């Protein structure tokens, strides 16, 4: 594997998880963020993800990975659109009911999720559209990084396909280490599902829709079920 690919995997496996946990510690040490602070957080995260995508795409294409290998080409357009929309609706519904369940629970995990929601999820109208832009960015950029580049790079080595799916899911879970152990497990399992779907469809498009849909629902259902109604406006 080329040296620059190793650097990218170092970014995915070490730098991004460390950065996420460090940012979360700083956020949790502060009182709940105001609208301006949330908008700055959303904008900085959007910028970071698009810069990461551009840098990784530059090195991937420069090293000979093709758009097809990266999941950027597809032949069955109708099937992919239907799969994307149906999957987004199904996973979004699951996210909705899971957050409703968490909102009724007590204990360390629900309390951590409430603190996280209080600081990063939109609670006012002015915050919602920028949050949706962040959700779409995460859907596009993270799917390219983990199901596009990482799977393509590993598949060019002697790593078996089943292990490629597990390794990239593990990296995806670590990227969400700021959510705690349950967050790592949940996103890791979602990463396995997305990795298998990537193999089935040969395209990132369905997973991008699924990922964005799950995050958008989190921005709607999270404040509704995890925070008191008085905090939303």
Please provide the spans of the model-predicted regions.
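Short helix-terminus and kink motifs of transmembrane alpha helices
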Residues: 18-26, 96-104, 148, 152
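Juxtamembrane helix-loop-helix connectors linking adjacent transmembrane helices
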Residues: 32-39, 61-137, 156-157, 227-233
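Alpha-helical transmembrane segments of multipass membrane proteins
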Residues: 15-17, 48-52, 87-95, 194, ...
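Transmembrane helix-loop-helix hairpins at the membrane interface
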Residues: 8-19, 114-233
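Hydrophobic membrane-targeting signal helices
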Residues: 20, 57, 61, 95-98, ...
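N-terminal, membrane-interfacial amphipathic/helix-forming hydrophobic leader that caps
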Residues: 1-73, 78-79, 162-163, 219-233
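N-terminal start-of-chain detector that recognizes signal peptides
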Residues: 29-31, 40-43, 105-111, 144, ...
């Amino acid at each position: 594997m080329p040296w620059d690919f190793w650097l990218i995997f170092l970014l995915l496996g070490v730098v991004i998880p460390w950065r996420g946990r460090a940012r979360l510690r700083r956020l949790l040490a502060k009182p709940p963020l105001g609208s301006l602070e949330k908008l700055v957080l959303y904008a900085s995260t959007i910028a970071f993800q698009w810069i990461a995508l551009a840098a990784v795409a530059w090195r991937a294409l420069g090293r000979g990975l093709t758009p097809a290998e990266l999941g950027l080409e597809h032949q069955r357009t109708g099937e992919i659109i239907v799969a994307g929309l149906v999957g987004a609706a199904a996973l979004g519904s699951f996210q909705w009911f899971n957050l409703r369940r968490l909102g009724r629970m007590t204990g360390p995990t629900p309390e951590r999720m409430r603190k996280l929601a209080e600081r990063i999820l939109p609670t006012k109208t002015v915050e919602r559209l920028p949050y949706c832009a962040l959700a779409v960015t995460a859907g596009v950029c993270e799917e390219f990084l983990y199901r596009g580049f990482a799977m393509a790079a590993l598949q060019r080595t002697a790593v078996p396909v089943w292990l490629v799916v597990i390794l990239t899911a593990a990296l995806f879970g670590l990227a969400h280490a700021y959510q705690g152990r349950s967050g790592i497990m949940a996103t890791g399992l979602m990463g396995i599902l997305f990795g298998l779907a990537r193999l089935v469809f040969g395209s990132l498009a369905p997973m991008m829709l699924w990922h964005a849909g799950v995050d958008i629902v989190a921005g709607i259902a999270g404040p509704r079920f995890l925070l008191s109604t008085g905090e939303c406006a």
